[in-house]
Design a protein with these regions (language model features):
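Bacterial Sec-dependent N-terminal signal peptides
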Residues: 1-25
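Second-shell residues forming the walls of enzyme active-site clefts
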Residues: 47, 94-109, 119-121, 186-352, ...
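Hydrophobic faces of well-ordered beta-strands that scaffold small-molecule active sites
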Residues: 53-60, 82-86, 109-115, 163-166, ...
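Short, surface-exposed loop or secondary-structure junction motifs
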Residues: 687-922
Length: 979
């Protein structure tokens, strides 16, 4: 008795602080319906026993089959329970079940779910958003509000009305076995702010909420699912810390509070769990803190409350303590009987039961159950996973990324040409999404280790480490709670701890507390936290490293003595491609994807192309990156994003042209100079004296092309002995095919043919590729450097464009290279691994007319550099003025629509005969390629389009792609999606 008096006195002292805040308390909005006509009518229809039934919420599963459904229906019909709490299953079945249950219920059921991080916590085929600890790192609480509104939308669309969230516990115990990553962190103010944002987002979207686990479960070493935890903190500490977020939430209009199963002597000296404590539920929560909303017990089947309490009796005591809803009672019949008996003997007043039932019914009316309609399930999964819902997840992940170290601002990576990068993913023996995304930016050598490592692997890795100057280490620890032993073997742990951290960027994909268990990790060149391991976190973390994303998250908890809460560095803004969803750049996913997919499938089904790659970017954000179809019509191998295509004449703007612009910036080249200024061989020819500005805009009067290859053949079709041999030799070193080797001096014949070719006196637009055979030599003459070495060093290596290359079979296997034509005239074989253009082939595969191979992604990097007026990856390649000059129409008065090297839209749009989509701006520029390729950039909309195909397989005579206008129609879809 004395103990009880002392406890009450202490609570009064606590009230001294709490009562002052009561003026700020905002009553839950649903309480306005407590005495509504609908609530009155329902109350009149209920017997005393049925009213008690309204306090009961029963567990329901949509994956347990028909017997479970029958059991739930029987419980609903027999006891008129107040609600259901849904757990594992799938959304469509859940909706069907809930509709069925509602149909059988006398009183509409309140549907609840424990979906702290979204429906994915319970249901398959739905989105799991970041854990609250990850959200705790986010600096913009508007995003927390947004997740609240989105989670509310999804939950309501599955027929439910109440979410047991947010978790308002302040997690200040790294070994907490049950809350931990479910908390917003250890700072009570931030926990309160984020809890309120999450709560308001849900409530403003029409969903009931429940803050938990009152009065605070953040500092326990015991999981209340298995045992009753005890919290021995003082009343002052509890009031100042654990209770703070709950008080703020109550003041902000919180709907509901979930009471935890805790033993807290400072609040109740008895050994009762807090759920059964009147001192905590009634005196503290209701009377002292002024909370008038729904009070819900934590699950009444948890051992923290059942170990020392019998079914039925424990439920009665929970009601006596002041709870409104008994969540997951063990035995509904016993619970109702015990409560009914307590009412009869006046240990529970009927008026108290009625008040609680009115409160529950008021919540139901607020949720719309007074006008119940079945929940539709048509297109439900698609609706739950719509583009905006997916984008929000990505936004939350990016905003949560926390960089704890970043020596020398190593992240984002700069100067890719100076880096030799390897990645090691630990905890996953297969290539991870993290590694796949790293590979989008540069050539990264990947290694994977499971949870253990053997000596042979250690030796192999040590050799690789010595040969690389940067290690990207991804740690995928499967242990969710740091109290558990880290999932790696001691041998592997020692290997990690012995890594040369001074050249290692570490990304930790799990609970941040666990970092404390890895020695020396604080010495990493850079240390990045993602808080959990998923494909999305892996993807965006990799983008962060290369500058496709940025970080400004702050650590929400302290990690031992290594890093304190609030730590976190801000990295530079985006400097390279961001791979994301269309909505992130203001495009409509459905319009974009369905429109392009359908056009590509039309092209494939009409045999215009066997397959393709398409990449679309807006504002430097890659919003579509897809591979379609097969390598050829006869080869069913699927096209991958890593496959490389012969880009044909797109080479014209991808090799020598950027080199010339670069040299112009260095005052080593000018478009006003002539061929003979750089190649004296052409002095005195009909090509002398013609400025490059005219030549590169195709109005110099040059012949369109020269069939150089025909000079290698006799009249009977055999090769002239001095031109081509079946085997290579010192005299015949130039590979055409595996059994065709060209004379080393044939390049001179090509130059001679160009020199002697006619030049028209009429200076009008006439497409010619002749000069592009000369440009590599001109670059070499100016720079005294091998042409390929020059463009690699000054462009491709810096861009990370690792597949943008000449002679791809020198770097890649044939399985990675897409074939082109089955050539019956010259090469008498399928062209695979060498350039399709005969002239380029006779130049050793190296020409500015054709010859380059690439995948869409690497080619897009060069094109994005153009679109960004000469910069990419925080480096300037070409000056803005030079790029503007080259991408502008030079001779419009001469009816010439071309830029310098670049193609431009026709001066007058010609409908289906135009070279671009109708909505492409006059500022746009690009090029097409004979093999079925196209790149196009539009500065007005900041849009980039890359299309790669091999329409020339099996023959160049296949012109269906042109007839279908597939490329320009796809381009128009982009503009339609922007609209």
């Amino acid at each position: 008795m004395k103990t009880k008096i002392v406890t009450t006195f202490l609570l009064i002292l606590l009230l001294g602080i709490a009562v002052k805040g009561q003026e700020k308390v905002t009553s839950p909005e649903f309480l306005k319906y407590t005495n509504s006509k609908w609530v009155d009518s329902v109350m009149k229809s209920l017997t005393p026993k049925e009213r008690i039934g309204q306090l009961m919420f029963v567990a329901a599963y949509s994956n347990k089959g028909i017997e479970h459904e029958k059991e739930i229906l029987e419980t609903i019909q027999k006891w008129n329970i107040g609600g259901l709490v849904f757990f594992q299953g799938d959304p469509v079945t859940q909706v069907k079940q809930m509709n069925s249950y509602q149909k059988q219920a006398k009183t509409p059921l309140l549907g609840a779910i424990d979906a702290e991080w979204g429906l994915g916590m319970r249901l398959d085929s739905t989105i799991s958003y970041p854990y609250q600890m990850a959200l705790g790192a986010i600096q913009n609480n508007n995003l927390i509000y947004k997740i609240g509104t989105e989670v509310a939308r999804q939950i309501k669309n599955t027929g439910l009305h109440l979410n047991f969230a947010p978790v308002a516990d302040v997690n200040n115990n790294p070994d907490n076995p049950v809350i931990n990553y479910r908390s917003f962190g250890e700072d009570k103010y931030k926990v309160a702010q984020k809890s309120i944002a999450y709560m308001q987002g849900m409530q403003n979207a029409g969903l009931l909420t429940t803050a938990k686990h009152f009065p605070g479960h953040g500092d326990t070493n015991t999981d209340s699912h298995y045992k009753l935890p005890q919290i021995n903190h003082s009343l002052e500490r509890l009031n100042n810390l654990e209770l703070y977020p709950f008080k703020e939430l109550i003041n902000a209009g919180l709907n509901g509070v979930m009471v935890a199963h805790l033993n807290i002597p400072a609040l109740d000296a008895s050994e009762k769990p807090s759920t059964l404590s009147k001192a905590i539920v009634t005196d503290l929560l209701q009377n002292k803190l002024g909370f008038s909303g729904l009070i819900i017990t934590d699950a009444m089947r948890m051992k923290g409350v059942t170990n020392n309490n019998k079914p039925g009796i424990v439920d009665k005591e929970a009601v006596q303590a002041g709870n409104d809803v008994l969540e997951l009672t063990q035995n509904v019949a016993k619970a109702i009987t015990e409560i009914e008996n307590a009412v009869k003997n006046n240990s529970i007043l009927q008026a108290d039961i009625d008040n609680r039932v009115r409160k529950i019914l008021a919540a139901k009316q607020w949720a719309g159950l007074h006008n119940y309609k079945p929940t539709p399930n048509k297109n439900l999964v698609h609706n739950l996973n719509n583009a905006n819902a997916k984008l929000l997840k990505r936004q939350l992940v990016e905003a949560s990324l926390t960089v704890l170290k970043n020596d020398d601002d190593v992240v984002p990576l700069q100067k890719l040409d100076t880096l030799n990068i390897m990645s090691i993913s630990i905890g996953d023996s297969l290539t991870t999404k993290f590694q796949e995304t790293l590979g989008l930016y540069d050539n990264v050598k990947h290694f994977n280790i499971g949870n253990d490592i053997n000596p042979a692997t250690i030796d192999k890795l040590k050799k690789a480490i010595n040969n690389h100057n940067l290690i990207l280490l991804g740690i995928h620890d499967s242990s969710a709670f740091p109290k558990n032993k880290i999932s790696f073997s001691n041998t592997l742990l020692k290997f990690i701890e012995g890594l040369p951290f001074n050249k290692t960027v570490v990304t930790y994909f799990k609970n941040p507390y666990s970092i404390a268990k890895i020695k020396n990790i604080e010495n990493a060149k850079s240390l990045i936290l993602t808080y959990q391991d998923s494909k999305t976190t892996q993807d965006i973390a990799a983008q962060l490293i290369f500058g496709g994303a940025s970080a400004n998250g702050k650590l929400p908890v302290s990690i031992g003595s290594k890093f304190k809460a609030g730590a976190g560095l801000t990295t530079a803004k985006k400097i390279r491609f961001k791979y994301t969803l269309p909505e992130d750049a203001g495009l409509n996913s459905k319009t974009l994807n369905s429109g392009i997919d359908s056009l590509i499938q039309q092209a494939i089904s009409n045999k215009a192309i066997p397959g393709a790659q398409v990449l679309i970017a807006k504002n430097g954000k890659v919003v579509l990156h897809k591979a379609y179809g097969t390598h050829t019509y006869s080869d069913t191998t699927k096209v991958k994003l890593s496959n490389v295509y012969d880009i044909a004449s797109v080479t014209k703007i991808s090799s020598a042209l950027p080199a010339l612009m670069h040299l112009q910036d260095a005052n080593k080249f000018s478009t006003e100079k002539t061929i003979d200024d750089y190649l004296p061989y052409f002095k005195g020819s009909n090509k002398a004296g013609i400025p490059f500005r005219e030549i590169l805009t195709h109005q110099a009067g040059f012949s369109p092309w020269i069939p150089y290859w025909q000079n290698t053949l006799r009249k009977n079709g055999s090769y002239k002995w001095h031109t081509i041999k079946r085997d290579s030799s010192a005299r015949f070193p130039i590979k055409i095919t595996s059994n065709m080797w060209l004379n080393r001096n044939y390049k001179k014949k090509v130059f001679k043919a160009i020199k002697k070719s006619p030049v028209s006196d009429v200076k009008k637009y006439k497409y010619s590729g002749l000069v592009f055979y000369l440009l590599p030599t001109i670059v070499e003459e100016i720079t005294s450097t091998n042409f390929v070495d020059y463009i690699n060093a000054n462009f491709y290596d810096k861009l990370g464009a690792t597949t943008l290359t000449y002679n791809p079979e020198q770097k890649f296997s044939h399985s990675k290279i897409i074939p082109t034509e089955n050539d019956f005239l010259f090469r008498h074989s399928t062209i695979h691994g060498t350039v399709h253009d005969e002239g380029a082939a006779m130049m050793g595969g190296i020409s500015a007319n054709a010859g380059l191979f690439s995948n869409a992604n690497d080619l897009a990097k060069l094109m994005q550099m153009y679109l960004d007026m000469g910069t990419y990856g925080n480096e300037e390649f070409i000056s803005k003025n030079t790029l503007k000059q080259y991408t502008s129409v030079q001779f419009p008065d001469n009816n010439n629509h071309r830029g310098i090297g670049f193609d431009k839209p026709y001066l007058i749009y010609k409908g289906e005969n135009s070279n671009t989509a109708k909505d492409a701006s006059k500022e746009s520029f690009g090029h097409t390629g004979f093999t079925g390729t196209m790149v196009w950039m539009d500065p007005k909309e900041n849009v980039l389009f890359v299309f790669l195909s091999n329409r020339v397989t099996p023959t160049r005579e296949n012109r269906i792609l042109y007839k279908l206008n597939t490329r320009t129609k796809i381009q128009q879809v982009i503009y339609d999606a922007i609209k």
